[in-house]
């Protein structure tokens, strides 16, 4: 009985090894440069060459300054977009994150809206967009 179990275990190991080995892609052995050129489907001369240039400290500072200028111009542009006249606040309104069940008045913040959950049982004023 032990011999048959040992034989079955050995057979199982060989089957596992054969299954794994059969799914591995075969390795191509290239003997020289000529076979590499004949087997490759893409010609390496078609691609442009790449040149590596070392940056000196002055060019690094210039690029940092340019990056800062770009960042500041983007911030200024976004600030210009955000600035818009706000409507005058009316006295009866609901503050942000306070309850605003349907008979309640509108939210005080013009960017906020009344959000209800659980079948309109829990409602609160929330700001949905950060750019507003």
Swiss-Prot record:
Glycans are attached at residue 39. Its main location: secreted. Residues 64-79 have a biased composition (Basic and acidic residues). Pfam families: Agouti (PF05039). GO terms for molecular function: melanocortin receptor binding; neuropeptide hormone activity. SMART domains: Agouti. Residues 93-132 form the Agouti domain. Residues 61-87 are annotated as: Disordered. InterPro entries: Agouti, Agouti_dom, Agouti_dom_sf. One of its GO terms (biological process) is melanin biosynthetic process. Keywords: Disulfide bond, Glycoprotein, Knottin, Secreted, Signal. Disulfide bonds join 93-108, 100-114, 107-125, 111-132, 116-123. GO terms for cellular component: extracellular space. Residues 1-22 form the signal peptide. PROSITE patterns: AGOUTI_1 (PS60024), AGOUTI_2 (PS51150). It is found in: Secreted. The keyword Disulfide bond applies. The presence of a 'disulfide through disulfide knot' structurally defines this protein as a knottin. Involved in the regulation of melanogenesis. The binding of ASP to MC1R precludes alpha-MSH initiated signaling and thus blocks production of cAMP, leading to a down-regulation of eumelanogenesis (brown/black pigment) and thus increasing synthesis of pheomelanin (yellow/red pigment). This is Agouti-signaling protein. It comes from Colobus polykomos.
